[in-house]
């Protein structure tokens, strides 16, 4: 069974309100859910986001994949960073969660290897095939100058 963390729309016309739910990927958007893990009110200023962090962490750990919208909300609350194993996740809402140090992060959360300290990143001046700014023509015809 493919499980997704996604948004379930409720509310009125032009007054959306979403529940962040865990559901089978084959069910309808507003169909049967396995568990509700949060709420999202996009109309409020500022938007209201509430996620039950321990339950979201559990579902992510057992393989539930968030949709793009749910992933954006998980990143805002810092739950995605906690799942990826970052020590200091950036969050607008502080929710204490303990993560076991022995677990490794899933492949989707791993970052590429950092650049070694001795290696220099290439700059524009290192590339001889690119023309420099000083090689640019200095004189521009008057008929082109007047046009904007």
Swiss-Prot record:
One of its GO terms (molecular function) is structural constituent of ribosome. It holds the Pfam family Ribosomal_S16. GO terms for cellular component: cytoplasm; small ribosomal subunit. It comes from the Bacteria. Keywords: Ribonucleoprotein, Ribosomal protein. Gene3D superfamilies: 3.30.1320.10. Disulfide bonds: none annotated. Residues 95-148 are annotated as: Disordered. HAMAP family: Ribosomal_bS16 (MF_00385). This is Small ribosomal subunit protein bS16.
């Amino acid at each position: 069974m493919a499980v997704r963390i996604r948004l379930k729309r409720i509310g009125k016309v032009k007054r959306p309100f979403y529940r962040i739910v865990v559901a089978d990927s084959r069910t309808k958007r507003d169909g049967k859910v396995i568990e509700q893990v949060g709420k999202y009110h996009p109309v409020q200023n500022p938007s209201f986001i509430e996620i039950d962090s321990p339950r979201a962490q559990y579902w992510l750990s057992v393989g539930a994949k968030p949709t793009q919208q749910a992933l954006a909300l998980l990143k805002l609350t810092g739950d995605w960073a906690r799942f990826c194993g970052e020590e200091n996740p950036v969050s607008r809402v502080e929710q204490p969660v303990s993560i076991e140090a022995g677990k490794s992060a899933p492949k989707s959360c791993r970052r590429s290897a950092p650049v070694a300290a001795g290696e220099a990143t290439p700059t524009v001046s290192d590339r001889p095939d690119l023309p420099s700014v000083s090689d640019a023509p200095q004189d521009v015809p008057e008929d082109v100058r007047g046009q904007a």
